[in-house]
Amino acid sequence: MKLNLAVVGATGLVGQTMLKVLSERNVEIGELYLYASARSKGKKVLYNGKEYKIIELNDENIRADIDIALFSAGADISKEYAPKFAKNGTVVIDNSSFFRMDENVPLVVPEVNSDKIKDNKIIANPNCSTITVIPALKYIDDKYGIKRVVYSTYQSVSGAGQQGLQDLENNLKGEKSTKFTSQIAFNLIPYIDKFDENTGYTKEELKMINETRKILSKPDMKITATCVRVPVRYSHAVSVNLELEKSFDLEALKAGLAKSAGVVLEDLPMPIDVEGKDKTYVGRVRRDFSVENGLNLWIVADNIRKGAATNAVQIAQQIILLKEVNG
């Protein structure tokens, strides 16, 4: 079934990767509409050998014949335009944070909760670091129950977009950062996004905490997080410490992880090795002997692909499948 698709934010890092993933996965598209800001109007983008002109995103240019729109243009754009697209009957898959905690909007990782898609006109893509850990945590929680989670993230500069990548390159030439508040080359920045005045956590850390609870349907799950920016171009890594409700056989747990959808079990997954891939890679699986039923994991995924673009395209594919089944 060929549906009409739009990509909003088509000139950005994630938007460009969405187009790449759509092509790689051979998603059948009727008409393709590529939107961006006024400064990109008229710019030409190549998709499957055909040139498409960028359409300026404004009220006048919202089309009624778009079946699915992939949004990756930031929370302010999603806030303003996603409801306008949805009002026309378009299903919006939004990569921003704006709708994620809306109780009426499903937060979807297809390997985990594709059943939540149903008839919703707006579907939220989780945060890139949340997507990285959720496939593994879903299996563990279903099988053994999770009492407590401790996240420590190592997030690449591409999580801050093209400007983040440029800062790293510029720093290596001896130039100052413009996106980050500090030098990122040969350095670690111990926070991501703004600080929450009430908790001392950053917005990025609160996203991981709240999104994990929502996706796993455990609003009271005990979770803490520390998110750190590291001088790596692509792929986020997360050290995960868990306290489980049930005792476990380590080898049986690892075998179950290896069979989980979207998960690849490896001894030592590294950011550079998973770049360009669409799975989440789990390694360093071992007991935490400091607590009863404790478990440590190291999880890595390409933040631009599985952490953003690929997850959104997978949701789109699920929607197409539902339309084919339901006619």
Predicted stretch roles:
Residues 1-184, 222, 246, 274-276, ...:
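N-terminal Rossmann-like NAD(P) cofactor-binding subdomain of oxidoreductases
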Residues 229-231, 301-306:
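Glycine-rich phosphate/pyrophosphate-binding beta-alpha loops
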Residues 233-238:
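Conserved glycine-rich beta-strand-loop-beta hairpin in the small C-terminal domain of fold type I
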Residues 250-260:
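Short amphipathic alpha-helices in soluble, non-transmembrane regions
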Residues 123-132, 200-209, 304-311:
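A glycine-rich, Thr/Ser-enriched phosphate-binding loop motif common to dinucleotide/cofactor-binding enzymes
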Residues 258, 263-284:
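A glycine-rich dinucleotide-binding beta-alpha-beta segment and adjacent secondary-structure elements
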Residues 187-232:
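Oxyanion-binding "anion nests"
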Residues 241-243:
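Short hydrophobic/aromatic beta-strand micro-patches
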